[in-house]
């Protein structure tokens, strides 16, 4: 029996993780759930999965939940301290980090220090603190298994000897606005940007997919997860989202992992590795399908170029890029900035940052904090 703490249980990845638990009650058990402030949803989860602890970031929401589940034997905690409580208890074996944003960095670090393995769906953790997180995992002998479909695909295609690896190829749908003119992009609304052609995801990652910043974050994540140089990480536009990523070896062979665009597949693999469990999910049927691939250089994706540049520069710059992007995306969703202003804001903040070595958590968090304040200043100016 594997016991789980699920961070972000009310979000897209979190609810799909619970679907895996629901279908495998003999193998998986929920120890703790954590979310932001969605009291109604997490109460339903509490009554179904009977966790021992629930953490909510918002204290008011935690107080309300405590009253709602008073009939259940559940400890309700709040804030970052409460979040850390859910990952450091001795009971859980694996922590699923499915919360969105840089806020996942601290609980991931504490979970590793507490001897937990990580099923990582929070790419911002590695973007902001990749060297620190991967170094901690290696030093403590803990495993970080990718949940992102692209990184799960790469992980499944890897051979034992890393010296045979030539490069990895991340695929991207290209989002809903591939090929649109600047005039068309000026008219993009949050509602239109939230309509992803293939995947059902949360709001922030859906906007990132539209701008291609999501793929940029994934390039940096792949650099850390697989210890690859940036010139060994390629991106291909693949609108059908059937091939989730590919690995090219030194002899020219290319291995690809294919599947339907269903996040439950990489989630389940991260929870069951190194074994595979049967499931009732719809199977991939390639009959009658045409798969196509395009060079992202054929389109104007400034976010992808910016992410490569920030990743190569390293230090605190990726954390700053990520923080500025989080603020800019949420401002767009709140109709405070236009769609085309998102990446311009991020680029401006990155250009103003004095890069430091990202050797400790405090330095990373300080850079993140500065970037958020500066981005807000630019939005208000």
Swiss-Prot record:
Gene that encodes it: dxr
Entry's Gene Ontology BP terms: isopentenyl diphosphate biosynthetic process, methylerythritol 4-phosphate pathway involved in terpenoid biosynthetic process
Lineage of producing organism: Bacteria, Bacillati, Bacillota, Clostridia, Eubacteriales
Cofactor(s) it depends on: Mg(2+); Mn(2+)
Positions annotated to bind 1-deoxy-D-xylulose 5-phosphate: 123, 149-150, 173, 196, 209, 214-215, 218
Residues binding NADPH: 10-13, 36-38, 122, 124, 202
Organism of this sequence: Desulfitobacterium hafniense (strain DSM 10664 / DCB-2)
Enzyme Commission code(s) on record: 1.1.1.267
Binding site for Mn(2+): 148, 150, 218
Pfam family, one: DXP_reductoisom
InterPro entries (UniProt xref): DXP_reductoisomerase, DXP_reductoisomerase_C, DXP_reductoisomerase_N, DXPR_C, DXPR_C_sf, NAD(P)-bd_dom_sf
Name of the protein this chain belongs to: 1-deoxy-D-xylulose 5-phosphate reductoisomerase
Name of the top EC class for this enzyme: oxidoreductase
Keyword Oxidoreductase: yes
